[in-house]
Amino acid sequence: MAAKKEFNIFDHVLVPEHRILSEEEKEELLKKYRIRISQLPQIKASDPAVVALGAKPGDVIEIKRKSPTAGYYYYYRLVVED
């Protein structure tokens, strides 16, 4: 049987930077926007970026994307089960 090839998804030019927020950062985010965690957009636990990060359901992911006008902008996703 052939060996499985490993690929780091974050090395791809089209994949933005992702990171898992700490519990303190998560609480700050919810207070800043005056929202409940259930109001965050969702991302499935099977998403390749989520799998690569090792995130689990309930974690909040911060995604940093390049913007031609703003430099960078951030958006957040709640990891949910499939």
From Swiss-Prot:
* Entry GO terms, CC: cytoplasm; DNA-directed RNA polymerase complex
| Listed Pfam families | RNA_pol_Rpb5_C (PF01191)
Task: For this entry, list what GO says about its biological process.
Answer: DNA-templated transcription
* Record's subcellular location: Cytoplasm
Q: Which InterPro entries match?
A: Arch_Rpo5/euc_Rpb5, RNA_pol_subH/Rpb5_C, RNA_pol_subH/Rpb5_CS, RPB5-like_sf
Query: EC no.?
Result: 2.7.7.6
Top-level taxon of the source organism: Archaea
Which GO MF terms does the UniProt record name? DNA binding; DNA-directed RNA polymerase activity
The UniProt keyword set, sorted, is: Cytoplasm, DNA-directed RNA polymerase, Nucleotidyltransferase, Transcription, Transferase
* Reactions catalysed according to its record: RNA(n) + a ribonucleoside 5'-triphosphate = RNA(n+1) + diphosphate
Chief place of localization: cytoplasm
**Quaternary structure?**
Part of the RNA polymerase complex.
This molecule's function is given as: DNA-dependent RNA polymerase (RNAP) catalyzes the transcription of DNA into RNA using the four ribonucleoside triphosphates as substrates.
Name the HAMAP family for this protein: RNApol_Rpo5_RPB5
As for family, the record states: Belongs to the archaeal Rpo5/eukaryotic RPB5 RNA polymerase subunit family.
- The molecule here is called DNA-directed RNA polymerase subunit Rpo5
